[in-house]
Swiss-Prot record:
It comes from Mycobacterium sp. (strain JLS). Signal peptide: none annotated. Coiled coil: none annotated. ATP binds at residues 257-259, 273, 344-347. PANTHER family: SERYL-TRNA SYNTHETASE. One of its GO terms (molecular function) is ATP binding. It comes from the Bacteria. Pathway: Aminoacyl-tRNA biosynthesis; selenocysteinyl-tRNA(Sec) biosynthesis; L-seryl-tRNA(Sec) from L-serine and tRNA(Sec): step 1/1. L-serine binds at residues 226-228, 280, 379. SUPFAM superfamilies: Class II aaRS and biotin synthetases, tRNA-binding arm. InterPro entries: aa-tRNA-synt_IIb, aa-tRNA-synth_II, aa-tRNA-synth_II/BPL/LPL, Ser-tRNA-ligase_type_1, Ser-tRNA-synth_1_N, SerRS_1_N_sf, SerRS_core, tRNA-bd_arm. This is Serine--tRNA ligase. Keywords: Aminoacyl-tRNA synthetase, ATP-binding, Cytoplasm, Ligase, Nucleotide-binding, Protein biosynthesis. PROSITE patterns: AA_TRNA_LIGASE_II (PS50862).
């Protein structure tokens, strides 16, 4: 959630952020009103409790003649306090709902507008000229790497089996990402893939896109769509030590997404699926270090993309395409020959203090005072990367060249029918 002090002092900046996202700026005024009403309700309840306490003291010291009137007043005050506390609870609920409804304030320079309003920051590599390219599914099936038919038989649409060297290719990607992360000071974590509602809400995934999340109703638990979620909850309600620098974690997990809003999109192959594996970088740092950490995360993603040897571009994602928690997001998109376009392989988001404020994750400043930490996240490898590898490294005879960095994991330089 956003910083209330910042909101009170800069309401126009928050309204502008809402507009750049395509969201309702009137929510800012609703929150300001709810904040004022909550503070008034707290003050009223506090004043009545103080009066009640003073009246109780008077009763103990009162003469027999004074006592009946004082007892009557004490009873009235008890009822008034009860009503004031109920009003305060109502005001708190209204305030919390209004606070949770506002997305993070976007960072200056983020392009305004929707999905197509991104800014291209860099383009790396030239797409190969491939005559009559095969798509990743045709290649994957011919090479015995991907089995969508049996995936659908077992689990339904958008599920699949990775088999043989297809499974080795994915495992190799994950291990490359783990190696890069641990070489750069990340702590490897294999987290739970089920989380409590307060953790899912704290990361910002139960807002407008709550229907994208799998929920186990009988247990009131959620399946994660990224290990960002459990890693954000890892230090919830804690004061962490950042005196030696940022805390960096790399989470390796299976991820689950309903893709409820994607009917008819990417129905072929493994570009958009319900289950996939991912290595996710997650960082806790001081707010003043967040921009530099964001650049570092992007740099590590680019190192990974260099290892799989595919053309890609880096974009500054438009405000209207950001998740509610992100203040800025960079995507790296790989060239997909059969689609003649770039598709997202990685994203990295600077969530500033938005998630940590919801989850009460703090650190101590140089004066020992607790402050809200900043959080960042970024993909280091995921199943979708197989799409870019297979399509960009396909050969005229239907084989696929294995990027050199993955050869030790796959056991061959060429995947052949």
């Amino acid at each position: 959630m956003i910083d209330l002090k910042f909101l009170r002092e800069n309401p126009d900046a928050v309204r502008a952020s809402q507009r750049s996202r395509g969201e309702d700026p009137a929510l800012v005024d609703a929150l300001l009103d709810a904040d004022a009403a909550r503070r008034a309700a707290v003050s009223a309840a506090d004043n009545l409790r103080a009066e009640q306490k003073a009246a109780s003291k008077k009763v103990g010291k009162a003469s027999p003649e004074e006592r009946p009137a004082l007892l009557t007043r004490a009873k009235e005050l008890a009822e008034q306090v009860k009503a004031a506390e109920a009003a305060q609870a109502d005001a708190d609920r209204t305030f919390t709902a209004a606070h949770m409804a506002i997305s993070n304030v976007v960072i200056e320079g983020v392009p305004a507008g929707g999905e197509d309003c991104f800014a291209v920051l860099d383009v790396v590599g030239e797409p190969r000229a491939i005559d009559d390219p095969k798509d990743h599914l045709e290649l994957g099936e011919a090479l015995g790497l991907i089995d969508m038919e049996r995936g659908a038989k077992v689990a339904g649409s958008r599920f699949y089996f990775l088999t043989g060297r297809g499974a080795l290719l994915q495992l190799g990607l994950m291990q490359l990402a783990v190696r890069l992360a641990t070489d750069n000071g990340f702590t490897l974590v294999i987290p739970p893939v089920l989380v409590r509602p307060e953790v899912m809400a704290g990361t910002g995934f139960l807002g407008a896109h709550a229907d994208e999340v799998y929920r186990l109703e009988s247990d009131d638990m959620y399946l994660v769509g990224t290990s960002e979620v459990p890693l954000a909850g890892y230090h919830a309600d804690e004061i962490i030590d950042l005196s030696a620098g940022p805390r960096r974690y790399a989470g390796w997990s299976s991820c689950f997404r309903r893709e409820a809003g994607s009917y008819g999109k990417d129905t072929r192959g493994i570009i958009r699926v319900h289950q996939f594996d991912k290595v996710e970088g997650f960082i806790y740092c001081k707010p003043e270090d967040a921009a530099a950490e964001h650049d570092r995360l992007l740099g590590w993603q680019r190192e990974m993309l260099a290892l799989i040897e595919v053309p890609y571009r880096v974009i500054d994602v438009a405000a209207g395409d950001l998740g509610s928690s992100a203040a800025r997001k960079y995507d790296c998109e790989a060239w997909v020959p059969t689609q003649q376009t770039y598709r997202e392989l990685t994203s990295t988001s600077n969530c500033t203090t938005f998630q940590a404020r919801r989850l009460s994750t703090r650190y101590r400043d140089e004066n020992g005072k607790p402050q809200i930490a900043a959080t960042l996240n970024g993909t280091l490898a995921t199943t979708r990367w197989l799409v870019a590898i297979l399509e960009n490294h396909q050969q005229p005879d239907g084989s696929v060249r294995v990027p050199a960095a993955l050869v030790p994991f796959v056991g061959t330089e060429v995947l052949e029918p």
